[in-house]
């Protein structure tokens, strides 16, 4: 997730969207001709976008909820709840959205401007647990509200009437419309929020959906659920599937087997499973705008409060070996926190990640020297490190790779790999109970600042406790330089250089997903940035 900042006006949202088309046929039961079988690799933590934010949740919300716009082919904005693409006024600081009057929730209630106000106020409140309140920065008073200095009612968003929403910004954000496709900005049924209170979104019966489908059968803990068409959806005539069935599948071999048995129409695979299927005609590679990395815990009582130890780990990991021999799914080595091909620096016309990659990304001799130096500075002869991952097979494999390299090459190092379910790993990490955490950041936008924001000292997702006034200053300047291309990208380069120097995160690889896809499946939008859209899917 997932997910998820400020952008330059010229950014391209959801760049590289691919429309999937069919070429041949899988055998399916006639009764299943309008049922789409899908998998997710992790648990849903909640359907409340103000309370949680992870990749599975956002994938589900993409099919069942809509904001002002949808992302179409090649990332083009398509009016959804809004009737048109809004042009700002007041020198770029005011957006007035007119909502379509035929938009309705799955329970029949009309979608109103107040539903957006309800959602955004809940998401910016200091009690929000999604970790995404920072994404509202730039909307009037959002930062002060999240810091507990102002009430949520002071947020710069107002329902002028039942179908008109006004948003006031603190400074011009020419990319603001592009943010409206994110699940963080989706509305919430005000009546349901009032009715269920803290239990809103804790199961599928406690949430209403305003998108093409509605979620059914999710109890809050189960690993299989379905989505059926929202009969009140304004574009119901273009929804062809009668049902989507989703299940959690964390193992690639299991995913492959289910695909072979026609129990999955889209199976994500990795590792040796993917390696053995590279010539399969149903295999599709999707490069995503995200990097898997090690989040280092910089707290004072932790070993990685020492910068030399962090740099030692960075230089000890052969990312090409990891990508080719462990992952084998098309993922590529990454030496920077920003994914390759995510964004081009327009002032240099170079790929940002490429131009900012350190000159050395693997040097075992130097790594050992830095490790010994760091251990001496800490006054220790040995150290035990806790590496927390989720319990997907691929995460376990990467964790074991890191464990092997660190224990084999660093004197006195022992690594405990804890591979636990997403809910457990999320809790351990948010509580600071880790030394290293294998995690993914999938950019919300095709711009480096989408990645950089979560490492600012005030960001609720900065679980590694990185605190750099210089880094914070670069991000603050970038937000206000949105209309000054040269200044903005200099801020971006400065921020990445600080990460290269401080190493609060150890980048590993740019995410590439390998999918086995039913060749009869068509109408799916796969995005390099953002969630896959199955709402207009059909079988040919």
What is the predicted function of each stretch?
Residues 229-276:
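Ligand-site clamp/hinge motif
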Residues 163, 169-239, 243, 253:
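Gly/Pro-rich hinge or "lid" segments in bacterial periplasmic/extracellular proteins
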Residues 333-373, 394-396:
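Structural transition elements
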Residues 112-114, 118, 162-166, 242-243, ...:
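Alpha-helical secondary-structure segments
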């Amino acid at each position: 997730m997932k997910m998820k900042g400020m952008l330059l006006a010229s950014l391209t949202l959801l760049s590289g969207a691919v429309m999937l088309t069919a070429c041949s046929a899988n055998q399916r039961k006639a009764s299943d001709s309008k049922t789409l079988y899908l998998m997710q690799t992790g648990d849903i933590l909640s359907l409340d976008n103000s309370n949680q934010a992870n990749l599975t949740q956002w994938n589900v919300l993409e099919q069942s909820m809509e904001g002002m716009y949808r992302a179409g082919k090649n990332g083009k904005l398509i009016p959804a709840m809004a009737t048109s693409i809004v042009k700002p006024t007041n020198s770029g600081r005011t957006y007035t959205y007119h909502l379509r009057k035929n938009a309705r929730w799955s329970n029949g209630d009309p979608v109103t401007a107040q539903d957006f106000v309800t959602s955004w106020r809940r998401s910016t409140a200091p009690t929000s647990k999604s970790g995404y309140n920072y994404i509202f920065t730039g909307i009037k008073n959002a930062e002060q509200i999240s810091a507990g200095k102002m009430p949520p009612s002071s947020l710069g968003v107002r329902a002028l009437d039942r179908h008109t929403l006004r948003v006031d910004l603190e400074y011009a954000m020419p990319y603001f419309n592009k943010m409206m496709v994110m699940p963080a900005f989706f509305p919430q049924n005000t009546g349901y929020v009032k009715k269920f209170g803290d239990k809103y979104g804790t199961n599928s019966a406690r949430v209403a959906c305003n998108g093409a489908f509605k979620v059914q059968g999710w109890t809050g803990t189960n690993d299989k659920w379905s989505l059926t068409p929202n009969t009140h959806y304004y574009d119901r005539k273009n929804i062809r599937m009668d049902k989507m069935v989703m299940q959690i599948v964390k193992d690639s071999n299991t995913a492959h087997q289910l695909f072979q048995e026609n129990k999955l129409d889209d199976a994500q695979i990795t590792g040796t499973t993917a390696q053995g299927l590279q010539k399969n005609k149903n295999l599709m590679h999707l490069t995503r705008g995200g990097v898997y990395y090690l989040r280092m815990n910089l707290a004072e009582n932790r070993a990685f409060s020492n910068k030399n130890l962090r740099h030692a780990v960075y230089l000890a990991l052969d990312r090409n070996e990891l990508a080719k021999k462990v992952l084998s799914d098309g993922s590529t080595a990454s030496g920077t926190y920003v994914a390759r091909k995510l964004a081009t620096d327009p002032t240099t016309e170079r790929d940002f990640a490429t131009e900012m990659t350190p000159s050395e990304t693997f040097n075992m001799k130097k790594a050992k020297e830095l490790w010994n130096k760091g251990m001496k500075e800490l006054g220790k002869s040995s150290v035990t490190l806790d590496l927390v991952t989720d319990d997907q097979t691929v995460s376990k494999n990467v964790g074991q790779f890191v464990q092997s390299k660190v224990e084999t090459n660093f004197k006195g190092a022992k690594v405990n790999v804890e591979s636990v379910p997403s809910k457990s790993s999320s809790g351990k990490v948010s509580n600071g109970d880790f030394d290293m955490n294998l995690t993914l950041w999938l950019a919300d936008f095709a711009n480096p600042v989408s990645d950089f924001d979560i490492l600012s000292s005030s960001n609720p997702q900065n679980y590694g406790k990185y605190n750099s006034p210089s880094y914070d200053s670069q991000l603050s300047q970038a937000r206000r330089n949105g209309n000054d291309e040269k200044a903005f990208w200099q801020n971006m380069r400065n921020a990445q250089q600080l990460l290269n120097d401080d190493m609060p995160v150890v980048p590993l690889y740019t995410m590439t997903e390998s999918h086995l896809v039913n060749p009869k499946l068509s109408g799916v939008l796969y995005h390099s940035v953002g969630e896959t859209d199955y709402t207009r899917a059909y079988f040919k």
